[in-house]
Amino acid sequence: MLAKVLSSAVLGIDAYVVEVEVDITMGLPAFATVGLPDGAVRESKDRVKSAIKNSGYRFPPHRITVNLAPADRKKEGAGFDLPMAVGILAATGLVNREKLERYLLIGELSLDGKVKPTRGALPMALAARNDGFAGIIVPEGNSRESAVVQGVNVLAASHLAQVVEFFNDTCELPPTTVSIQDLFSRDARYDIDFNEVKGQEHVKRALEISAAGGHNILMVGPPGSGKTMLAQRLPTILPGLTFEEALETTKVYSIMGLMGERAVVATRPFRSPHHTISDAGLIGGGQVPKPGEVSLAHNGVLFLDEMPEFRKNVLEVLRQPMEDGKVTIARAATSITYPSRFMAVAA
């Protein structure tokens, strides 16, 4: 009994399609996951088993093998729970396979079968649109973020049983839609404003010139003179984000799980890392590469408060991202490029 469900994984700030192949054969009960899964993916077998049982379905007491293709790329995160569960039910004949190849599925499962939000929903929705899928099934918590992508049906699911009934044509999942114009008009607001600064005319003039030309700026002054306050208000006088800029910035925040309740990042980011930050924390890195502060400040402002306190090697690694507007992290298996076009403000 073999079934194939389509899902997606993130590489850099973009996503690619992953084929979740489920094979159920006779033998002693076992659950094996292959295709370079990380710890969260390997642990999904226990979540999937409990979710299927607690949703009212029978978990097959046989040998189950799950392959995540392409098998030469590292798969991470809990977003494969939902496609694995649907694949197991499809292999046992409990899910109609006719519509499976037309939809991407992503989502983490709780033990009671509820579908929980996952990281990277926006780039995955873009991958679904670019590869010509009819739609993508996402957790309810990711639906508004994914619906920012035009040209693909975004279907929100709150429970595994809903997804099963959708593929069996006994339940409809209504598409989620959002108005980009309304999102920008509501969310493109700052809690602080540049006009709150009284006095400091020469500094304000320098910041206005810096904002107009996209120039980096260094502020020097005694403690308490307002350097940090002025830097925090600099994004409020920068031009508003275009939709393309907002989409690119949102992709970075989406894969880091920093979206919260927002559907899109509609304001210029402001990042102020502590002076004890490492070079990997600043430009990105790690065993499984992740974006750093320079990428989280993409299309916004990176503020280096107490710049002399930063370690020399940390300041040195800023040179290439500032010059190129991107940072490339090379590992033995792959090379990943993150965007890092920002205004640097130091004090």
Predicted regions and their residues:
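Peripheral, non-AAA+ core regions of ATP-driven protein-machinery
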Residues: M1-L218, P222-T228, A330
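Conserved catalytic/switch belt of AAA+ P-loop NTPases
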Residues: L315-I336
